[in-house]
């Protein structure tokens, strides 16, 4: 397979920095039809794109050098869902009512829902463009399963069961996709695995097929706006960061996978180049990520801590490591419980709100403030402070639709993750309760803008936010951003 051969070549030469790189090929003459292409790279780390690997990524380097670029701030929390939709609606997670992949469905103790496309009720860029008669094609923009009607086409994201499901709109678009890429993957089967070589192979195969589909859409469809999101970057970081980062606590010097992230980035740039060479001079290009990546030093067992502090009371001692929902909780004595992930959410047990609420409403803010102070004081495993941030949703969002968590916890500036499981018998853990995972998300992503008719001279942009993406796209089509969008069109020149 072409992509894997390219990767092997990169592995052989990557450590010497000798990878051959062709310059960006000239574009086709202008067609007179203004278009915008977005290449989304889930989790792409700005320090790698703008610094460490930049010289070996000639296609992105060309966009950067002739365009405008900068770091872009993600949502709080910096999580794929809702970050991509915050970018494309210019609404914060509270306004969307989506605080992560899993959200409370009601005020019971058990019922949660996974935020799929139906959870997003705010209009996105393509909705506004569709009303103006413009056609959009979307590839893997989370969350996009089930696919929604759009003036154009939509291919479901990694939340789709597989490519055999009804993961496209219109439904017959699926047949076209499978003709172009018969083994199309919406995601790799399991990125938290010890079989690293098999994972790496699947990431390459998946990404190559995604770009085959993007090129097909560029060439064969009538479109004004085309956007893709490549999830392979995220899966690569979570699976291979310890090999790439010498400061990672689990780094393995000399491991054969040492250059796995480097080689993929260089190869990915070639895939991007294959798309760029199909574009005319009336197509503006944006490349951005929803957040960045950084090493993960370890995990903090939020529910173990809540037990030790007397906030969470169990009816039984766990036998082994188990999720909270598998343990009997004494809700009549419990004041708070938490969930794990790349960040934590803490929920309070409030009288008149939860079925067995114990915190009087008059004490709600006092308990929240008490928890904030205590959680921020949790040290690392050596007793050192770790710069944890704890947020009240009502203070960081413009609205809090649906059921927000009572507290959002960012442990150790995202160098630490939250572990919700019980039975660890320790506050700190260095094994992921959901499988091997080397990286956490970073607050800053990357942004590149390129207009082939304007040489912006590689201007560095500052103070960018994900919320600015939607107004920027609308401006490219001569449309004003609706007044309820919270971002602003990025001034690139």
Segments (PLM) and residue ranges:
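Generic recognition of well-ordered alpha-helical segments
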Residues: 59, 370-377, 446, 468-476
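Secreted, luminal/periplasmic, and some membrane-associated catalytic domains
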Residues: 34, 41, 48, 55, ...
């Amino acid at each position: 397979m072409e992509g894997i051969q390219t990767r092997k070549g990169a592995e052989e030469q990557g450590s010497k920095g000798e990878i051959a790189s062709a310059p960006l090929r000239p574009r086709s003459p202008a067609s007179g039809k203004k278009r915008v292409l977005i290449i989304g790279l889930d989790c792409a780390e700005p320090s790698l794109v703008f610094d460490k690997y930049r010289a070996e990524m000639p296609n992105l380097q060309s966009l950067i050098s002739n365009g405008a670029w900068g770091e872009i701030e993600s949502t709080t929390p910096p999580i794929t869902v809702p970050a991509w939709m915050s970018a494309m609606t210019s609404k914060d997670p509270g306004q969307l009512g989506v605080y992560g992949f899993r959200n409370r469905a009601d005020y019971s103790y058990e019922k949660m829902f996974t935020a799929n496309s139906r959870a997003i009720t705010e209009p996105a860029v393509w909705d506004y463009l569709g009303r103006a008669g413009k056609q959009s094609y979307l590839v893997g923009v989370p969350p996009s399963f089930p696919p929604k009607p759009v003036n154009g086409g939509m291919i479901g994201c990694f939340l789709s069961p597989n490519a055999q499901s009804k993961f496209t709109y219109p439904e017959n678009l699926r047949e076209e996709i499978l003709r172009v890429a018969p083994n199309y993957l919406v995601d790799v089967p399991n990125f938290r695995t010890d079989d690293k070589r098999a994972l790496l192979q699947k990431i390459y195969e998946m990404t190559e097929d995604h770009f085959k589909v993007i090129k097909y859409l560029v060439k064969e469809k009538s479109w004004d706006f085309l956007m893709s999101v490549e999830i392979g970057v995220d899966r690569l970081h979570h699976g291979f960061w310890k090999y790439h980062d010498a400061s990672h606590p689990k780094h393995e010097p000399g491991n054969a996978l040492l250059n796995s992230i480097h080689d993929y980035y260089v190869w990915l740039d070639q895939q991007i180049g294959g798309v760029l060479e199909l574009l005319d001079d009336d197509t503006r290009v944006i490349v951005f990520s929803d957040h960045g990546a950084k090493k993960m030093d370890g995990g903090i067992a939020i529910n173990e801590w809540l037990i030790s502090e007397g906030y969470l009371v169990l009816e039984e001692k766990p036998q082994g490591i188990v999720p909270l929902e598998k343990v009997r909780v004494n809700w009549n004595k419990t004041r708070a419980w938490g969930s794990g992930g790349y960040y934590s959410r803490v929920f309070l047990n409030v009288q008149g709100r939860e079925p067995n609420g114990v915190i009087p409403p008059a004490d709600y803010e006092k308990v929240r403030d008490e928890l904030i102070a205590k959680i921020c004081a949790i040290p690392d495993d050596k007793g050192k402070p770790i710069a944890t941030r704890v947020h009240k949703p009502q203070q960081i969002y413009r609205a809090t639709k649906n059921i927000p968590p009572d507290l959002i916890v960012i442990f150790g500036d995202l160098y630490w993750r939250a572990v919700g499981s019980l039975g660890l018998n320790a506050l700190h853990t260095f094994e992921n309760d959901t499988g091997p995972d080397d990286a956490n998300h970073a607050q800053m992503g990357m942004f590149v803008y390129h207009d082939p008719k304007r040489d912006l001279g590689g201007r560095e942009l500052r103070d960018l936010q994900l919320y600015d993406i939607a107004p920027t796209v609308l401006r490219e089509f001569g449309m004003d951003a609706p007044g309820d969008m919270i971002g602003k069109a990025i001034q690139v020149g």
